[in-house]
């Protein structure tokens, strides 16, 4: 999973964060009685905390990954902005604030009883028609040593003229990632990547009844506004990555326990930016961002994720339960995975000579769930299907090659012409085959659907075919 990105390279990244800066206050206490004055809980406050919020929390997330970060935006000339700057300086974040006398620092006060949020108070005034040439010049200077830019738009006015920051960064060849709150995505035209949540995305395009509709509307926006990709975060459903080219990729959520989703989007865009700066592509970056989101929602409040936490989570995913299993052992492993709320994806094939098309297909299949099972035709089964000269590689050799791929969790052999019986035993959440199949043609598909599962296809990577490779070798 995302093994092509060396996350230790995060510390070499330099990222500029520009946007709506906020201060988050938290009052914690116990709510054990109802007020005699009104039917509301009385909170006995025993702890007060202040944290950076908005674009400042994005910068904090970037810094937690070890990257160098410059933060710029608008604040009030008040105690809140000075408190915020002190908090950020402690994390080695370089702040460039434009302070306004008649504008308060956006502050959000949350009151919690037994760690449950009871009330939020907002202290803010939205900027209208704001543009500061001095801040834009500072931004231009910062671009000269940056590898990526994050524009954190909370619709508070700091990015009223968002076109200029996008254009100046793109002129220097830098990726521009935008966390959008505006319902007018044309404002972000030319940006590299947008990271809306599902609610924000549907506020722009309308309700999407299916994943196909979601992908279609996202792709239309990509072409209309010259984006390279859109990453839609969907809470418990995970994420969907839609790029200019290729099929959309669904990434299943990793979180088993969710305590607080506050600031999870900030973590996602921070990891995306750091991963792109470290040389990753959108898919690899999204895998890591999805993993980070699963970690941060287990924490209370607007929290961050560190490289050691990411590394441990990656190790747990890649190290657990990989290998060739018997059918009996597979069923036990599947039962254990289901007990932990994991989504099971299954596919099958001969996989006689593994090629890049197979790897692309298997990675896309793994992205649909937590565990990927690959059922492999044994030698006699391949011979019946492909002819007496096949397979080229023995069953054991084929399975050993497959287990070397990190996308695959379990490999299991079967002897029949189709894996229908095995699929009926496993009953995966998602059954996958290549795009040259119709869902109605896929063995075992009917039973999976009856059990509430899905039968999906993945487009075939053009130019790759085992049969053509064999023919080429023979000739």
From Swiss-Prot:
Provide the active-site residues from the annotation: 266
Annotated Gene Ontology MF terms?
ATP binding; heptose 7-phosphate kinase activity; heptose-1-phosphate adenylyltransferase activity; phosphotransferase activity, alcohol group as acceptor
Q: Which pathway or pathways does this protein act in?
A: Nucleotide-sugar biosynthesis; ADP-L-glycero-beta-D-manno-heptose biosynthesis; ADP-L-glycero-beta-D-manno-heptose from D-glycero-beta-D-manno-heptose 7-phosphate: step 1/4; Nucleotide-sugar biosynthesis; ADP-L-glycero-beta-D-manno-heptose biosynthesis; ADP-L-glycero-beta-D-manno-heptose from D-glycero-beta-D-manno-heptose 7-phosphate: step 3/4
Q: Which UniProt keywords apply?
A: ATP-binding, Carbohydrate metabolism, Kinase, Multifunctional enzyme, Nucleotide-binding, Nucleotidyltransferase, Transferase
CDD domains attached to this UniProt entry: RfaE_like
Annotated stretches, region: Ribokinase = 1-321
Q: What is its EC number?
A: 2.7.1.167, 2.7.7.70
Q: What is the enzyme's main class?
A: transferase
Matching InterPro entries: Bifunc_HldE, Carboh/pur_kinase_PfkB_CS, Cyt_trans-like, PfkB_dom, RfaE_dom_I, RfaE_dom_II, Ribokinase-like, Rossmann-like_a/b/a_fold
From what superkingdom does this record's organism come? Bacteria
Chain segments carrying region Cytidylyltransferase? 346-475
Q: Which GO terms describe its biological process?
A: ADP-L-glycero-beta-D-manno-heptose biosynthetic process
Q: Give me the residues that bind ATP, please.
A: 197-200
List, alphabetically, the GO terms of the cellular component aspect: cytosol
Q: Does the keyword Transferase apply?
A: yes
Q: Is Kinase among the key words of this record?
A: yes
**Which proteins does it associate with, and in what oligomeric form?**
Homodimer.
Report the sequence similarity comment from the record.
Answer: In the N-terminal section; belongs to the carbohydrate kinase PfkB family.
NCBIfam families assigned: cyt_tran_rel, PRK11316.1, rfaE_dom_I, rfaE_dom_II
Q: What is the annotated role of this protein in its UniProt record?
A: Catalyzes the ADP transfer from ATP to D-glycero-beta-D-manno-heptose 1-phosphate, yielding ADP-D-glycero-beta-D-manno-heptose.
- What name does UniProt use for this protein? Bifunctional protein HldE
